[in-house]
């Protein structure tokens, strides 16, 4: 069965699947302006660090194609202003900032006599190449992740894997990161069962990951976030694999709220805990997880579901969207260039050395 598409782009039109309405309704919103793209990201109609970056970039592309600029300088100013605004949509996912930095570097590299047409083509080529690159990267992550989980097992053993939040086709251009690893295991007929958490308070696991598993015929079971420790104790979980919104130089990883407690439970039960993310999610400018800006979401997302209030009126809320899992709880970090592991006896990763060793640009 074909994988789901969170982003549809045909070179002229950009459609974004409204993931807030899933799984009850499948509806695509057309992005016509920079503000439309910002709203889709901020309101979490599109989410997942890779998808956020792609939608932001394609937003610039479609608006640029419908606009005219007298000079290359005028076009460059439009791109820079658009990036400045789009950066403010979600602060934790590093892919958006990585994309913006690379696009700004591309603008800076153009010769002084660059024409508007030449600059337009350079910007569009970079942006439109992002989707295909993301799909290829995700498939490589799936391959390397499956190998890492299976490497010490005999060929006839099937695995049970737990994941958190949504990291599949709905969070990327296609295929997925952590869910891509599960897909790869399933394609190899080495997956016995996938378990996904509901992922409160936004229920990305219940609404989105469960939807992807059912749609694609992958054997799966939904569990409440509070069931994870008992699940590991009683159901024989082989590995945990989660995504990442930002991995810093020592391997500390920001991911959807609830990831940290799953990592603690995995450590206690001796379950390998893997992070799956493209190298664009690795932020070598930050040394430790304490430096990551953690987005806080409106309290209504915690007290209401589909507009219906569940919590007692007047109760206070604290609603961080992410937490940081320390490197010492992480078994390996799966990327499109291979799996990063800690040196023997070390509690932290050396992501700079790993990135250099695999030729990260």
Curated annotation (Swiss-Prot):
Pathway: Amino-acid biosynthesis; L-methionine biosynthesis via salvage pathway; L-methionine from S-methyl-5-thio-alpha-D-ribose 1-phosphate: step 1/6. The active site is at residue 245. It comes from the Eukaryota. Its EC number is 5.3.1.23. GO terms for molecular function: S-methyl-5-thioribose-1-phosphate isomerase activity. It catalyses: 5-(methylsulfanyl)-alpha-D-ribose 1-phosphate = 5-(methylsulfanyl)-D-ribulose 1-phosphate. InterPro entries: IF-2B-related, IF-M1Pi, IF_2B-like_C, Initiation_fac_2B_a/b/d, M1Pi_N, NagB/RpiA_transferase-like. GO terms for cellular component: cytoplasm; nucleus. Keywords: Amino-acid biosynthesis, Cytoplasm, Isomerase, Methionine biosynthesis, Nucleus. It is an enzyme of class 5 (isomerase). The keyword Nucleus applies. It is found in: Cytoplasm; Nucleus. The keyword Nucleus applies. GO terms for biological process: L-methionine salvage from methylthioadenosine. The record marks 165 as: Transition state stabilizer. Belongs to the eIF-2B alpha/beta/delta subunits family. MtnA subfamily. NCBIfam families: eIF-2B_rel, PRK05720.1, salvage_mtnA. Catalyzes the interconversion of methylthioribose-1-phosphate (MTR-1-P) into methylthioribulose-1-phosphate (MTRu-1-P). This is Methylthioribose-1-phosphate isomerase. It comes from Monosiga brevicollis (Choanoflagellate).
């Amino acid at each position: 069965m074909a994988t789901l598409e969170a982003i549809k782009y045909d070179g002229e039109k950009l459609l974004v699947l409204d993931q807030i309405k899933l799984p009850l309704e499948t509806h695509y919103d057309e992005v016509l302006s920079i503000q439309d793209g910002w709203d889709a990201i901020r309101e979490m109609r599109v989410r997942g660090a890779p998808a956020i970056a792609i939608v932001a970039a394609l937003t610039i592309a479609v608006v640029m194609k419908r606009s005219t600029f007298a000079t290359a300088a005028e076009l460059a100013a439009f791109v820079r202003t658009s990036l400045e605004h789009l950066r403010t949509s979600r602060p934790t996912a590093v892919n958006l900032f990585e994309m913006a930095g690379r696009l700004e570097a591309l603008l800076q590299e153009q010769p002084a006599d660059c024409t508007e047409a030449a600059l337009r083509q350079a910007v569009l080529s970079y942006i439109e190449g992002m989707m295909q690159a993301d799909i290829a990267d995700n498939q490589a992550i799936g391959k390397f992740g499956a190998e890492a989980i299976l490497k010490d097992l005999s060929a006839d053993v099937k695995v049970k894997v737990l994941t958190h939040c949504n990291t599949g086709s709905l969070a990327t251009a296609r295929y997925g990161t952590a869910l891509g690893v599960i897909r790869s295991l399933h394609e190899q007929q080495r997956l016995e069962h996938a378990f996904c958490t509901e992922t409160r308070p936004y229920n990305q696991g219940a609404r989105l990951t469960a939807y992807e598993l059912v749609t694609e015929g992958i054997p799966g079971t939904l569990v409440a976030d509070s069931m994870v420790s008992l699940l590991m104790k009683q159901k024989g979980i082989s590995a945990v694999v989660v995504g990442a919104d930002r991995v810093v130089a020592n391997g500390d990883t920001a991911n959807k709220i609830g990831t940290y407690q799953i990592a603690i439970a995995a450590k206690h039960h001796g379950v390998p805990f893997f992070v799956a993310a493209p190298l664009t999610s690795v932020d070598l400018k930050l040394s430790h997880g304490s430096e990551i800006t953690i987005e806080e979401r409106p309290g209504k997302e915690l007290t209401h579901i589909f507009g219906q209030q569940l919590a007692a009126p007047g109760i206070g809320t604290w609603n961080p969207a992410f937490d940081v899992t320390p490197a010492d709880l992480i078994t390996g970090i799966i990327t499109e260039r291979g799996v990063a592991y800690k040196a023997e006896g070390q509690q932290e990763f050396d992501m700079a050395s790993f990135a250099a060793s695999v030729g990260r640009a």
